[in-house]
């Protein structure tokens, strides 16, 4: 029996941080043997907002190398670059032509980012969810790992599938597969070190708001030392008046691979002066093997290029099958080759 297929990806917009790792990538690694996995570096998504063309290519390689360093296993998973598979752009256009504009205008993430960009907001940012839908649908994904902030985009993908299948498919022969969300509640939202009510993000202007996977020990120590806390003694979870306390305890729980109950007992009587060195030591120990593996991978650039090339080829072969099916359903003349 074929394994269910998963599709997910990360933008190459700077270093990955603990939010990316604990909220997504680590769960991919833990579950990968149960699925047929396609993990993408979504560089086309990265240019929907202002980006640095001088660093995009290197950032793309960094994300691919970090996938491997974090434990993505090529026995179970395919790693590829989104822009290297032309079918993503073509399917996105075909989906655009059947997706109502008002579906996109109600997307919460677009509204939030459009406010920041003002008149300079791009059509690409508005259309981001349709490209995401193309990413998912090209690979007939059964499951899509999503955080709470991406659930609306996956719901849009499902709406697009239903619309296309109703218009162009048959009940016994749908054009596109309807994907299901794969939501991991524990650690799904790792919050900022500077504000426990905001998600840890690469787009935050302050480097002190996040711990990057490639941060050296001294930088981790500095960031934990400066992270926002409160004056209370004793540490506990789930207090809405202490969001930073809950966030830092959650980080320690995930990085130390302990249960919430064990951490609650261990830290109940601690002050921040005792807890912060403990969190620092735990974060450094958790990231050391990832950083060592990353350095090993980058030391053999040729092998990394071969991995990406092989992944691109496999992804393209799979994607072309779906694209041909959609083109046929929409009535296009098949190319004579």
Curated annotation (Swiss-Prot):
Keyword list, A-Z: Aminoacyl-tRNA synthetase, ATP-binding, Cytoplasm, Ligase, Nucleotide-binding, Protein biosynthesis
Binding site for ATP: 11-13, 19-20, 147-149, 190, 199-203
Motif residue range(s): 'KMSKS' region: 199-203
Pfam families membership: tRNA-synt_1b
Family statement drawn from the similarity comment of this UniProt entry: Belongs to the class-I aminoacyl-tRNA synthetase family.
Molecular function as annotated in GO: ATP binding; tryptophan-tRNA ligase activity
Quaternary structure and interacting proteins, as annotated: Homodimer.
Residues reported in the UniProt entry to bind L-tryptophan: 135
EC number: 6.1.1.2
The protein's name: Tryptophan--tRNA ligase
Record's GO cellular component terms: cytoplasm
Localisation: Cytoplasm
Main localization, broad class: cytoplasm
Catalytic activity: tRNA(Trp) + L-tryptophan + ATP = L-tryptophyl-tRNA(Trp) + AMP + diphosphate + H(+)
Family matches, as NCBIfam families: trpS
Motif ('HIGH' region): 12-20
